[in-house]
């Protein structure tokens, strides 16, 4: 299953994301499509006040769209284009490049963990289906800063 996860390069998923800071916590529902490093997108489904916001990566360009306000912005040669901790392939790349990447099986789950660039990421996978269930991204103090719950996952590769 670990090799299966590490070979994913195209998928669609619907995730619940909780981002925690010192003072508050924000929750989002996001639809992600990933078709390789050059073609991926995220669309906010909830909360309603930012629903319809899309972040689309096309090659080295980043396009932001807000369908509710009929706005589009394009950023060419955007240098932080691949810096997206929320997507599954970001975890996969960090796992492959991380010196302290490891996995274990516990209670019917495969738990993959990596610690790269001061970010500890833990991915929990159902051992029977091979589908990701949740990911935790911890800050320097080992507190969960981002919690991602995979609601729907469709792997294309």
Where are these regions (language model features)?
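Beta-strand elements of well-folded, non-transmembrane domains
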Residues: 17-21, 34-38, 46-48, 127, ...
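Amphipathic hydrophobic-ligand
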Residues: 24-30, 51-57, 117-119, 144-147
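N-terminal leader/targeting segments and the immediate start of mature chains
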Residues: 1-38, 157
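Short, solvent-exposed coil/turn segments at beta-strand boundaries
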Residues: 8-10, 33-40, 56-61, 106-107, ...
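An acidic-aromatic
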Residues: 34-86
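Non-cytosolic head/periplasmic domains of membrane-anchored proteins
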Residues: 66-118
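Gly/Pro-enriched, hydrophobic low-complexity segments
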Residues: 102-157
